[in-house]
Regions:
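Active-site-proximal helices and loops of the catalytic beta/alpha 8
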Residues: 69-72, 270-286, 292-315, 319, ...
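Hydrophobic faces of well-ordered beta-strands that scaffold small-molecule active sites
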Residues: 160-162, 235-237, 285-287, 383, ...
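Substrate-binding/active-site clefts of carbohydrate-active enzymes
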Residues: 166-378, 410-416, 433-434, 455
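Short loop/turn motifs at secondary-structure junctions
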Residues: 68, 160, 231, 250, ...
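Short, flexible loop/turn elements at secondary-structure junctions
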Residues: 64-66, 78, 93, 107-109, ...
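Carbohydrate-interacting/catalytic domains
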Residues: 6, 20-165, 171, 177-180, ...
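Bacterial N-terminal signal peptides
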Residues: 8-18
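Bacterial N-terminal signal peptides that target proteins for export
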Residues: 1-9
Length: 667
């Protein structure tokens, strides 16, 4: 239903009740648009329906300096007629501080995709505002997006993810542990290492055959820690299907849980316990889908064997008459074939044309891999797609029309089983091409828009450990740019990790400084998107490049007696209590390149929150513009981390923040 705000009545704006019958002048009609006051985004305060249906008209709100604008309008491009449309906006209210005016206009309902910006004038002065920022010239990109009928899962928006590399988390069933020399694969014998010892192999070049015994039963037994102590309610598991390696990214059989991790029954029990409430709030589970390539031990390929695995038919490597021959691309059979980054042990799957056997095998049929685990008796809640941009045909490496066709088909297949399932793509760059039309992924692993810039700002290194340092202004520009081309529902489900199984550990990049880990955790749990905690990051686990970023979990740290774990628990709890931190608007408040302070606001109809981050080593005071959040003078504001209360004075908040720490100031 369209939300309308009457002119001379009590209104709810930015979380405060305000009654005004007139407009006090804060600015003047001086032929100069006051840009620092302009704001809008697709939070619920400024967009009446961020994820509309085709039947929903959308009331859009713009904030400006009080008394500044002489006119405002919405300009939107409609893909239905490939034309721009212009909608005049009208003044609807001012705010409790007497600082801002609010203007509103309505985009009519339709089923077509649209992009919009605001055009504002003060006499002879004109400016435009869109998702990319404010300009004096009409922008050519970065418009806010409206995609009727596209909705990302609310459980992703409101949840906290916990990523687990199964072999290194907890050994819950010693009977399935891989032993020394249990089998050989690609010339390497398996090595059984004791928990807490080195992840590096005793035999050079055999790192993928080092095992510690972690399994699905172990994860099940530790759900109380994950759901309760940490507070996470979305569990993302690195690959669990049958494979000769410890990482399982070289799948042998997609329909069988690896024996070292358990059985189909073990997986079903784990999923039921994640969904249940016996170990904490009901949760969700996402499996890792490695569908760009298989392992060379797959019965589909048949180059390598291990253990007692036998295949009923020859694989593509063994015979050109194999029923699986077209599952792969050979340049010169059998030895030259397309593979993942040239790794012969990971032959690339060939998706062929629409309707191909490969597409039916992976996603398009009821018995396909993806649909099998979405359906009973498993009922997983989503898939993370490994190297998702690369799925393709004829040995091509993706990011092309065929890849997008595959992803559209894949989405249709997944949502036909569960419309609320998550499709999470792995991509290290700007993933907008898969996210800006609502027909492919719901979100992506946010390396580009969170992991990398936050690491460079706090640690002075990128996610790989390479030296790279940015200041607060650059940080803010990169964060804004990464959000600008994404629908708001996607922004709210991008997974924000400090590190993953493919990066150096955050604590290691930060030189082992636990204070910087604290700062990273505060940023992660208050930023826009789904926080994704890689197991051990909650206590500052260290580790260099693969395989050192996959150390075993230190269970002596797994309690709130550990300061970092206690902070993580508190931050997750705060995020759960304050919807503004999950789906509220995001506004930059301060970028201090000299004192290394960055502040932003999160706000919705219930709360206004200022997050202030101190990236210097010493305690500092910071003054942030509370008026930007419509906090009134004299009103109290509480730091949710310390419990300390401050008061707004002259439109500002002045707070003291310890080195490499933050404040979460709520009203």
């Amino acid at each position: 239903m369209l939300r309308r705000i009457p002119l001379l009545t009590c209104i709810l704006l930015v979380g405060a009740l305000s009654c005004h019958a007139g407009r006090a002048q804060a600015c003047t009609h001086d032929n100069k648009v006051e840009r620092s006051y302009l704001f809008s985004d697709q939070g619920r305060l400024y967009d009446s329906d961020p994820e509309p249906t085709a039947n929903s008209s959308i009331a859009l709100t713009l904030r400006a300096c009080r008394g500044d604008l002489t006119a405002a309008r919405i300009e939107y491009y409609d893909t239905a007629d490939a034309s721009f449309h212009r909608i005049p906006m009208h003044w609807v209210s001012d705010d409790p501080t007497g600082t801002f005016d609010y203007w509103q206009g309505t985009v009519p309902a339709s089923r077509s995709k649209k992009g919009y910006r605001f055009r504002v004038t003060d006499g002879s002065s004109t400016a435009w505002l869109n998702a990319a920022g404010i300009t004096s010239r009409e922008p050519s990109s970065g418009d806010f997006l409206i995609i009727p009928g596209f909705k990302t899962p609310d459980w992703m928006k409101n949840g906290v993810m916990y990523q687990i590399f199964p072999d290194r988390f907890y050994d819950g069933d010693t009977s399935n542990d891989v032993t020394n020399g249990q089998y050989r694969y690609a010339g390497c014998a398996t090595e059984r290492h004791a928990w807490g010892t080195s992840v590096f192999p005793k035999v050079k070049g055999c790192r993928t055959e080092v095992f510690f015994g972690g399994d699905l039963a172990g994860i099940d037994q530790k759900l109380g820690y994950i759901k309760g102590t940490v507070g996470a309610d979305i569990i993302y598991l690195n690959p669990i299907f049958m494979s000769p390696s410890n990482h399982k990214y070289d799948t042998q059989n997609y329909y069988r849980v690896d024996p070292a991790f358990g059985t189909a029954a073990t997986l079903q029990h784990l999923i039921a316990d994640i969904h249940g409430s016996s170990n904490g709030p009901p949760g969700h589970v996402i499996l890792d889908g490695v569908f760009n390539h298989s392992g060379d031990s797959s019965c589909w390929f048949g180059k390598e064997t291990y253990g007692s695995i036998s295949c009923p038919e020859p694989g593509a490597f063994q015979s050109q008459s194999s029923p699986y021959y077209r599952y792969y691309t050979f340049q010169s059979w059998p030895d030259t074939y397309s593979s993942f980054f040239g790794f012969g042990g990971m032959p690339k799957l060939d998706y062929g044309a629409s309707g191909s056997a490969m597409r039916r095998q992976i996603y398009a049929s009821k018995t396909s891999v993806m649909q099998t685990y979405l359906r009973p008796p498993y009922r997983i809640d989503g898939w993370r797609l490994d190297v998702a941009q690369s799925l393709d045909a004829d040995g091509r490496d993706g990011s092309d029309a065929t890849n997008h066709e595959i992803m559209r088909e894949l989405r249709a297949a997944v949502t036909s089983v569960n419309p609320d399932a998550e499709i999470l793509g792995e991509f290290w760059g700007d993933a907008a091409a898969w996210l800006d039309d609502g027909k492919e992924w719901d979100g992506a692993m946010n390396y580009n828009g969170f992991t990398r810039p936050i690491s460079e700002w706090i640690c002075g290194e990128d996610e790989t450990g390479k030296s790279a340092s940015i200041n607060e202004s650059t940080l803010d520009r990169r964060l804004r740019a990464s959000r600008a081309d994404l629908p708001v529902g996607v922004q709210e489900t991008m997974t924000n990790a400090l590190g993953t199984h493919d990066t150096e550990r955050f604590a290691t990049r930060c030189g082992g400084d636990i204070r910087k880990v604290y700062l990273g955790l505060i940023f992660q749990l208050t930023y826009l998107g789904t926080p994704a905690i890689y197991y051990g990051d909650e206590y500052g686990m260290q580790g260099g490049p693969d395989p050192d970023d996959r150390r075993t979990f230190d269970w002596s740290r797994a309690n709130t007696g550990d300061a970092a774990v206690a902070l993580t628990h508190k931050l997750v709890s705060i995020r759960g209590r304050y919807s503004a931190l999950r789906t509220g608007s995001y506004v930059t408040l301060l970028t201090d390149d000299t004192r290394h302070i960055y502040a932003f606001g999160r706000l919705d109809a219930a709360h206004r929150i200022a997050v202030v981050l101190n990236n210097a080593s010493a305690t500092q005071t910071a003054t942030v513009p509370a008026y930007q959040l419509s906090m009134t003078n004299g009103s109290p504001v509480t730091d949710l981390l310390t419990g300390q209360t401050y008061r707004v004075s002259n439109g500002n908040l002045t707070v003291s923040i310890e080195g490499h720490y933050g404040a979460i100031l709520s009203q």
